[in-house]
Amino acid sequence: MIAFNNAKEMEANGEQGSALIVEYERVIYKLGEGPFTEAQNHIRKEVYRNLYELTIMNDDEEKAKHYKEMADSLTDLTSSED
């Protein structure tokens, strides 16, 4: 996924501001509403965790709470399907 790779590259280059938040939000938008594959679910969880950390660093506690709740609500699809 190009948007996810762009966000990871921005992060690796030291970006921590609103541009990176927008890029991660773009990843969520591009994934749509599902249903999601295991890989997509993993990406969503990682993106929400990253958004949580970024919004905490940018002092936006309301958004941070939302992103943390979204990350915590996702479970791995492999954990209970046998």
Show the residue positions of the predicted features.
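Structural motif corresponding to the intra-repeat A-B loop/turn of tetratricopeptide repeats
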Residues: 13-14, 58
